[in-house]
């Protein structure tokens, strides 16, 4: 490995590489979420017949993982670089390995392993065949071929590549703590994120108002359902994301029992499934505009029979 890229140079390198592979460069979605997969740029676009190739950075919040900034590798909020390609290219793994080379990691000089780890997200009714990618013994990426999203079978199959940017940067820069990562020349990761990490951890574990969160969950759930009754998919999905984050805050606070936890997840999943079905129906009414004309004509003709 030659030059040690800064955090932002890693992002810029990945953006340029995946742009060259035909991916649109999207921006982070402006709602709290636990993973890049939950962005509508993945969750909604992975279903239905239309092609979709996109890449974006997604800050991901996981309240239960907060450690007050005292753990060098476990965070309330981390950053993922998300790539989704639909239909999945037959050479997606080769494309991924080539992206590592762009970051200065020669696959021939390192121990890179694809370790089977099938993926599931119960709260969104999503699952797929998956692998963790290990670089010299450290997981840096999750690879998934979606089989189901929002309770719907995916066709064509979407490939998802999720880079853990903090882990990748720690490896490239050879640092033991994420807070020592160089974000930009002369600016460390900790100088930007250590204080927010401490404050969000304190809030999540000690300060959050449980009664307010419980009330908010109910309100967000009702508002999602109300939006869906009017066929408003995207506002509804925003409220599904709010339900998910609110539940994660309640879970971190220890405010839900094991039995209640299952119930909350089921409620979020039920909403997500309705969102998914409504989205596909909405795209069909529009004539699946991202499809080429020949494929669109065949699909719409089949549905008319």
UniProtKB/Swiss-Prot annotation:
Its main location: cytoplasm. InterPro entries: aa-tRNA-synth_II/BPL/LPL (IPR045864), Gly-tRNA-synth_heterodimer (IPR006194), Gly-tRNA_ligase_asu (IPR002310). It is an enzyme of class 6 (ligase). It catalyses: tRNA(Gly) + glycine + ATP = glycyl-tRNA(Gly) + AMP + diphosphate. Gene3D superfamilies: Bira Bifunctional Protein, Domain 2, Class II aaRS and biotin synthetases, domain 2. One of its GO terms (molecular function) is transferase activity. It is found in: Cytoplasm. Belongs to the class-II aminoacyl-tRNA synthetase family. Tetramer of two alpha and two beta subunits. NCBIfam families: glyQ, PRK09348.1. This is Glycine--tRNA ligase alpha subunit. It comes from Streptococcus pyogenes serotype M18 (strain MGAS8232). The gene is glyQ.
């Amino acid at each position: 490995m030659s030059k040690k890229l800064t955090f932002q140079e890693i992002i810029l390198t990945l953006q340029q590489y995946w742009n060259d592979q035909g991916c649109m460069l999207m921006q982070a979605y402006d709602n709290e979420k636990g993973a890049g997969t939950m962005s509508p740029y993945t969750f909604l676009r992975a279903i239905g017949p239309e092609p979709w190739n996109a890449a974006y950075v997604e800050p991901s919040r996981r309240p239960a993982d907060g450690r007050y900034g005292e753990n060098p590798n476990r965070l309330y909020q981390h950053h993922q670089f998300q790539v989704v390609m639909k239909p999945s290219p037959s050479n997606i793994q080769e494309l991924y390995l080539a992206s590592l080379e762009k970051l200065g990691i020669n696959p021939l000089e390192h121990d890179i392993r694809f370790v089977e780890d099938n993926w599931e997200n119960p709260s969104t009714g999503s699952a797929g065949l998956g692998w963790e990618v290990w670089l010299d013994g450290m997981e840096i990426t999750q690879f998934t071929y979606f089989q189901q999203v929002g309770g719907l079978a995916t066709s064509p199959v979407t490939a998802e590549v999720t880079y853990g940017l903090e882990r990748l940067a720690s490896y490239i820069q050879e640092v033991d703590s994420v807070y020592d990562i160089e974000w930009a020349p002369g600016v460390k990761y900790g100088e930007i994120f250590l204080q927010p990490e401490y404050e969000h951890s304190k809030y999540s574990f000690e300060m959050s108002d449980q009664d307010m969160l419980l009330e908010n969950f109910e309100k967000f759930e009702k508002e999602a359902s109300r939006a869906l009754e009017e066929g408003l998919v995207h506002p509804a999905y925003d409220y599904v994301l709010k339900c998910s984050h609110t539940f994660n805050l309640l879970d971190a606070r220890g405010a839900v029992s094991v039995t209640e936890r299952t119930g909350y997840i089921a409620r979020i999943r039920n909403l997500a499934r309705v969102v998914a079905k409504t989205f596909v129906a909405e795209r069909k009414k529009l004539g699946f505009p991202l499809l080429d004309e020949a494929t669109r004509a065949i699909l719409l003709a089949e549905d008319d029979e």
